[in-house]
Structure formats: structure tokens, C-alpha cells
Amino acid sequence: MADSVPGGHVLLAKNSDRPVSDTQPLRFLPRRTAQAGATLRLAHVEIDDVEESYAHLGGSPYWCWGHEEGLNEWGVAIGNEAMFTRDWADTVSAVKGGADRDGGILGMELLRLGLERGRTAREALDVICSLVDRYGQWGSGVVGQPPVTGGYDNSFLIADAQEAWVLETSGHRWAAKQVTTGTYAISNQPTIRTEWDRASGDLVEHAVDSGWWESAPGRPFDFARAYVDPGTPLQLSHIRLQRSRQLLGEAVGAGGVGLGQAQQVLRDHYEDTFLGGPYFNAALPDFLSLCMHSHPSDFTWGNTAGSAVFVLPKRGEGLAHLWWTPVTPCTGVYVPVFVDAGRVPGIFAAAGTAGVRACPPEHAPVDTYDEGSYWWRFRRLLDIVKGGESAWTFNENQSVVRRAFDALERQWTAELPQVEKDALALRERGEHTAMADFLAGYTESCAQQALEVLEHLVAQLSG
């Protein structure tokens, strides 16, 4: 979801839903350079590299070169969602029938390339659109699955301090809509209907030629209706999309969407609705919720693997940063992380026993617990809170976790304005190394506090 309030900061918030053991560390990637004519090998295709790629933070599945969410040194933030389209469905059908299909670029790779090559949200949009035009999207994005079961098209929220864009793609084609104020939410379905600001040149023609849209006098072309896969039930996405819209609208009506409101949206399981929340508890979900949990019957595809709120202030009004927590945000604590720090705590960037690598997901080893991984420490806490697959103890234990972690978030939220002020003062004096060290030290301090509270909770709830 994205929010832009006149006179306020742009916020972009994102939950990343992945298989239960798809470890998602948070890494800092410095600027890198490439020689003229160099190429870049991605999971399923080789593309042209560029001379200089920008530094950024990225939350990535442990096996993936690309990211589910990220923030670059210019204050551009991007999050993506899987989207199931007619182009995707036709390709799946053709491949199952024996056809060959060249690889394309994964949505997570497109996201990282946008961060590496875009100094503004609009530049990042241009980067992603040009790559979709040229290479398309095809390949597995899920560990252990081939493209026909692990592939998907993608939608993106792309924002900087000035503007935000919604980009929705289908194979080699796309439509984009600019967001200049207010709020916008996406889920795993197209949301752009009859109005957009930019699009592929043959967007309408392709749909008509494919038999997905019948032109008629006075009927405006509806991108979502034409391109959404009718074989993928919208129950997978529409309830979550509408819940996001409802919560954002309520927050706007109550004065605006701030950090706390964004975090609450990401932690939502339909509490305070006519559903009353899940029948038993969030760890035994009845529907796909915004904060997603795996179900013993596997009707959900995993857990939320990472969650972030990106804060994008105008220059001089603060520092672009994100509040990040691994695993399900309802059992996690959001820690402030600054791209200007030039690094993250080593434990943030660590996976489990498989380590961090870049390889096709079909070849990635299954990751398992390691004490040196911040992600796995929080995954272990989630398992303890649940008390087993039947999640008998989730409700009682989750309230204990929230009391402890909410206190930390309140503390850091109160401290952050002074932290930003002190960091900006160092930058104004040209002390960039000192500023980076100061910000990195602050995040390290927050991480250590979080781990101390986590270990206390583990001991308390395991007793």
C-alpha cells in the first residue's frame, strides 16, 4: 500500500508472503560498476548490465538475486506482488502441452533492477517497463517448483518523496497509474481498470487479438477485466485488497496514515470486522489475511516472510528509511534501518544453514534454522507462540509478545526524530562517514534490544 498526504511524508508498506521456510534476510548492496558490454546473469535469462548500479537495501528470499521490497540511496522504494494474468495462464497451458518457452525476468529481479537503475520513482518505472517490454516474465519464483507451478506475473508500487506509481504487468505488457495524493492498495490481482497514465503501445490490441476483450461502441477498455486470469479465483486476493482499502480509508478519516497505522494494517487478520477475526486464531486462518499464516491444510501458501514500512521524506525534512521486521509482523518488532548507514547488522543479512546465494529456485537447497540468522530467530519465536501445528497457545502467547515488542516500537518511534536531526547535522558538516557510523550504530542498538527481548520471550513462553 502507498500513502501520500499533503504536507506529510510518502509511506510505502509491504508484506512479503512466501513459503514457510523461504528465509528472507535484509541486505545492503553497495554501488557496483560494470564494464561496457557486460551482461548480468539472472535466474532464467541473461541481460545487458549498466555501467553503474545504485546502492540499496533489499529484503530477498535467500536464494534470489532480486528483492521483494527495497529502498535505494536516492530514496526510491519499491514493493511487488504476484499477479495471475491471461498471458501467464496461456504460457502455463502451452508449456504443459510441450511447447518451449524462453526464460524471462522474475518480478523480484525487476524490482532490484529498478532500485539499481532509478534515481526517481519515474526512472525506476521506466527501467522496469523497458525490461518487461524486451524480456517478458517467465520462470519459477518459488523454491522447489518448476515455472508452470512457481511462475507468475507481477504488480509493483514504486514511490519516492514526490510521487508514487502503480505498475501492473502481463507477460511483455503493462499499465501504470500515477498516485499523487491519498492512498492506494494492491494485492494479487490487477487494480487498474479503465484509467491509466502510461501503458504498452499494444495493450488493447493484444487483448482484442487474443479474444480477451470484445470492443463495443461506448465501452471503455478495462485492463483488469481483460487481463486477469479467470482460472485464478479472486478469493485469493480481493478480500485482502478490500480490507487494505477499508483500513486505509478509516485511517485517512481519522486524520491520516502514519507509521503506526501502516504497521497495524500490515498486522491485520480481520479483527474488528463482522468476521471477528479468524474463528480460532490467526495461526489457523480462515481466509488469506494481510498478515498471513500457514495453515495445516496448506490452503495458504505460507507465512508473511518479511514486512516493511518505507518512510520517504522530502530532502531536508528527514532521512529515507524503513521499519522492518522478519516473519509475521503480528509476532515481530519493526526496527528502523537507514540506507545512508551503508550497511545493516550482519545478523539481518544472514540466512540459515543454506546461506545466502543466487540460483534458480528449482536448485536451491531447503534452508533450516541457524542461530546466527535474525530471520530464523523470529521464525523460531513464531513457532513457540503457536505451540505446534494446531496453534493451541497462539492467542495467549501473541498478546504477551505484543506487549513486549510494542513498548520497543514506542521507544524507537520517540527517539527517531532526534536520531534523524543528529544525523542530518553530521551530513551538513560534510561528515558522511560519521553519519553512516552513527545510523548503523543506532540500528545495531535497536537490533540488540530486540534480540534481548526475544530471548526473554522464548524463555518465558517455553517454560
Which residues fall in each region the model found?
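A contiguous strand-loop segment
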Residues: 1-106, 127-259
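Short, conserved catalytic/metal-binding motifs centered on acidic residues
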Residues: 12, 124, 308
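Short, well-ordered beta-strand elements within core beta-sheets of diverse protein domains
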Residues: 111-117
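Short, charged, surface-exposed loops that flank catalytic or proteolytic processing sites
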Residues: 117-125
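Intrinsically disordered or highly flexible coil/loop and linker segments, enriched in small
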Residues: 120, 137-141, 275, 317
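Accessory "access/gating" subregions that flank catalytic or transport cores
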Residues: 241-302, 309-311
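Substrate-recognition/cap regions that form aromatic- and gly/pro-loop-enriched pockets
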Residues: 288-424
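Histidine-centered catalytic/metal-binding microenvironments
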Residues: 399-463
